């Protein structure tokens, strides 16, 4: 697969059937009534008035980007977020998802809590979290198969494109998974 061609790159959000096994941190750029809904949903709310200040303070913007896994934003604030925080959030793949005025942010947040992001960028390797050590082997297997099936669906030759597959814990050794083509 030629990943220099952007159409061959993969960026997928996979819904994990057994969840991520750890809490997900989600923030929302919102004001007024929508910020009250976001707080009620358990989201951290970032006031739209501070977006410009964060854009001027690169270090604070990076800390914020690293603190949260996903971002949501009211549609009117998307342009401001892109202008001031796009250089920080964009390369991390954390640009906010727009939330229409008639949609409850809790619905979107609940969907993101069980989501893993699979990105290839311009390298031929994928790195993604599929769960935590506290989950059982059956749960981790279900999550791994969900990710595997989604990635295989995107590759033109399926398993023929896979040279090797490894599974590892954060600080543990890696184990090779046999890929049968």
Task: Label each PLM-derived region with a short phrase.
Residues 20-22, 32, 121-122, 159-161, ...:
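Short flexible coil/turn linkers enriched for glycine and charged/polar residues
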